[in-house]
């Protein structure tokens, strides 16, 4: 194994959720779940979609899709999923279509659900010998190493926490991950890229013309692939799939600049593609349909950004901004692409504020606040003690006031992490 590949593979394994479960089968979804969320799960039913004569997308096996291009002289695999075992199942489905050899693999960006499953499709020996190329942006390997080396352990914890990875797949717990089925966490089989580029790359692979373009958005090293012969746009996560884009991800990330993301979406619109293949969710066909999805997505991101900046400059703090900035009905109702299955308006607003102004909101009390446990102890005493706090929390829960119930219980938990009632 190449030295950097070995390091990167270890680091990638640190950024995966600590546990994962299979997606909940449709027949096990009961009426207790939100009907819209139940309907959303159906977007990720396992299926290999044929988009054009030579382009296929495998949806529903794992969090990330895998796309296959059948070129005259061999196959080009776009992204590899997070799970080598699930990706082997996908490759078995592809083998029902063609027996051509794999000639190239493309990593659209450095996130684990797009690069970890590569050895389901190729071996290190094939890459080392030059039989197979691995194509990516020139910064991908540095991003893999930097993320894992610096914050890999905590990203793993936060990723598992934000995805609810320890919860069982039931109608009361987990159903889907918003952009796909629940993640399948496995050790990474990452192999380093052999061909990289900076801004754009027009090339011929396995007898087929391909155009690559760097379009920073959901990731700083995001690239898309365009097939001019049949006007197919493989949009990576610039168009993130059936959800409001997550301008901020709860697991933690560097600032995702909404202005840059909007510019990248406009670059995709300029292709006037007949087909679009995102790497999460189903493909979109028809030039007008592709244009509508891209335009509405860019309008949604632009609106959130512009209104946040507008009210930020009027002095509103993040807690005030999240109550002020709302998508208008024509955007909020654009199902599924602007619904809050993965990204949310409130999370995005806080990210934008922090990206421009940092953590300080202007209240001097926040410069040196009381430690959380000290604050909880004083507030619980002020409210009459633990029993009264928990009674109030229980009453709020029974009334459906779940946020207040959680906040009250949080004070008791800060005093005693093993408090079973809290």
Residue ranges and their predicted role:
Residues 24-25, 50, 75, 82-84, 142-214, 260-272, ...:
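Metallo-beta-lactamase
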Residues 43, 48-51, 72-74, 85-134:
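Active-site metal-binding motif and surrounding structural segment of the metallo-beta-lactamase
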């Amino acid at each position: 194994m190449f030295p950097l590949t070995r390091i990167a593979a270890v680091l990638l394994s640190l950024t995966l959720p600590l546990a994962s479960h299979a997606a909940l089968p449709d027949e096990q979804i009961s009426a207790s779940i939100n009907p819209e969320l139940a309907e959303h799960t159906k977007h990720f039913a396992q299926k290999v979609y044929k988009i054009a004569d030579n382009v296929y997308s495998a949806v529903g096996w794992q969090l990330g899709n895998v796309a296959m291009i059948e070129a005259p002289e061999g196959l080009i695999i776009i992204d590899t999923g997070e799970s080598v075992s699930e990706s082997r199942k996908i490759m078995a489905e592809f083998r029902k279509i063609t027996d051509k050899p794999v000639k190239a693999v493309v990593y659209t960006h450095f996130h684990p659900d797009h690069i970890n499953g590569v050895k389901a499709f190729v071996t290190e020996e094939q890459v080392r010998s030059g039989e197979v190329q691995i194509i990516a942006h020139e910064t991908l390997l540095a991003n893999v190493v930097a993320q894992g080396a610096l914050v890999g352990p905590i990203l793993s914890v936060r990723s598992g926490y934000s995805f609810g990875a320890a919860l069982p797949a039931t109608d009361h717990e987990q159903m889907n991950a918003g952009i796909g089925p629940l993640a399948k966490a496995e050790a990474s089989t990452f192999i380093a890229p052999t061909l990289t580029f900076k801004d754009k790359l027009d090339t011929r692979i396995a007898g087929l013309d391909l155009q690559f373009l760097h379009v920073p958005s959901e990731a700083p090293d995001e690239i898309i692939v365009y097939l001019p012969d049949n006007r197919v746009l493989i949009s990576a996560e610039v168009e993130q799939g059936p959800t409001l884009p997550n301008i901020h991800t709860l697991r933690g990330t560097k600032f995702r600049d909404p202005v840059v993301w909007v510019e990248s979406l406009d670059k995709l619109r300029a292709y006037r593609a007949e087909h679009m293949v995102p790497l999460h969710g189903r493909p979109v066909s028809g030039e007008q349909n592709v244009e509508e999805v891209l335009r509405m997505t860019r309008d949604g991101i632009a609106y959130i950004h512009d209104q946040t900046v507008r009210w930020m400059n009027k002095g509103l703090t993040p807690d005030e901004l999240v109550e002020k900035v709302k998508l208008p009905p024509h955007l909020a109702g654009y199902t599924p692409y602007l619904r809050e299955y993965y990204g949310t308006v409130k999370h995005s607003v806080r990210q934008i504020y922090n990206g421009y102004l940092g953590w300080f909101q202007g209240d001097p009390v926040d410069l040196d606040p009381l430690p959380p446990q000290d604050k909880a102890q004083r507030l619980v005493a002020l409210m009459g003690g633990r029993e009264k706090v928990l009674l109030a929390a229980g009453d709020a829960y029974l009334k459906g006031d779940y946020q207040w119930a959680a906040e009250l219980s949080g004070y008791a938990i800060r005093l005693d992490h093993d408090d079973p009632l809290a």
